[in-house]
Amino acid sequence: MEDTNKEEKARMNRAVADSADSRTLPVLLPSPGSILLVSAAPDPLAAELAAAGHSVSTAKDLLAANSTSEASLDAVVLVDPRGPLTDILRAARRLLREKGRLAILASTPDLKARELVVALSEAGFVILKGGLPPTVYLARKESFFVREYAAGDEEQILPMFRKSFHVERSLARWSWEYRENPYGTLRISEAFSEEGQLAAHYAGYPVRFHREIEGRSDTLPALQVGDTMTEPAFRHVGRGPTSLLGRTVRHYYTRFCEGQVAFNYGFNTGNIQRFSMSFVGARRLEDLPFQVLDVARQRLALPNRLLGRLAGYRVERIAHFDARFDELFRRVSPSYRLLVERDARYLEWRYARCPDAEYFLYAVFRRRRLVGWSVFRAKAERLIWGDALFDPHYPDAVRQLLARVLAAPDHSQAKTIEAWITSRPAWWREKAVSLGFESRPEPDDLGFVFVPFGHDPEEEFRAHLYYMMGDSDLF
């Protein structure tokens, strides 16, 4: 047993010497200062640090280092930390001065990178460098903590949302989006000051994408990201990846994305899009395919009764989604290739149960068979066509449904229909163009932005992705 312990100590000394000798740690800890080195075998690292001008004290167990005064150290170096990580990081933070450095050196894979990133964020550290070979993390003590949602946070989230987006969001709407989603709840990361004030927020809700490409059919878990915001008083804290939003995004990616979803996506513009692409690995797929139908110029006349009967189409306004919509999705999804899984469970949550939004839901039937559906919202003289799914074997169902909708008393004021109409699948865009839809610049210069995790979907997105406004949180 004694020989085994000696071999283990020798192995650890070699690993630490290789990764954290005078060529490495002086770069990570550039200013000579007071350092506590916590290691089962502190030599030769202690000597290397002392030679670089640091005042070095050592301990084998940080939790037992009671002789060190609070907020007295410039740096703490942890070598292969053992024990409850949360307690260890809390103890290190207590001993560090403001802006003090924490270096973590791991010579074994026992310390999981994801767990460490989350723990550092939640303990009040900003990560300066991470994943250096071998596992070396450098962090700095800060006066903000990043963590996932806790009960009651919505009391600060909703006022911040109102201030950030100039829109009033009810508690019912927030609960629907983040508590009642059938595919997962409370995917929220937040930064708080030491006084408990919400400083930054990043969130998303789970969706499932259905893919049928090259004979393969599968489901891709994803997150639709939105509600990205920072309290104006704290926007000066850090820059880029060390800003409060950057730290919150890193926590979110580690806690909710890596190893859990294929990708996340969202629709944004301006500063947040530039930030996402510069600092958190986002890519812009394309400008949004904004299309407008001028109702006065391109009237969609209803067919006469005789022709209508012969064609066999019937359009109904509906209130809920049932098993017929599951059957439609199974039947037509191969024609769309890649899209959010629009089954009855998702549609019922997304549209039938969504509070504070008046959606108009329509279904079109050929004889007794469901061949398509659509969802609309009315905004003054604009009718927003937010979602749709049609059987391509019944292309006239699109015109039949739109004509019936425009003829309904609820929509008599509509002068335009606006929609995001992708060029994928080709028949879908072709049908829209044949009805008179025209491409226009998207009013807010929004783009489709995504971040891959474990699966890079860009090539498949460009070839096959179908989406509409209802796939965002903007509809």
Regions found by a protein language model. Give the residues of each.
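Conserved alpha-helix/loop element of class I SAM-dependent methyltransferases that forms part
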Residues: 13-33
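A short acidic, Gly/Pro-enriched loop at the edge of an enzyme's catalytic core
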Residues: 65-76
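A short glycine-rich, Lys/Arg-flanked "PGG" loop and its adjoining helix->strand segment in the class I
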Residues: 86-99
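Conserved beta-strand signature within the Rossmann-like core of class I S-adenosyl-L-methionine
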Residues: 99-107
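Core SAM-dependent methyltransferase catalytic element
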Residues: 123-143
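Active-site/acyl-donor-binding loops of N-acyltransferases
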Residues: 135-137, 206, 262-309, 366, ...
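Short amphipathic alpha-helix that is part of the acyltransferase structural core
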Residues: 142-177, 183-192, 224, 305-345, ...
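Conserved donor-binding loop and adjoining core beta-sheet/short helix segment
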Residues: 151, 155-260, 366-396
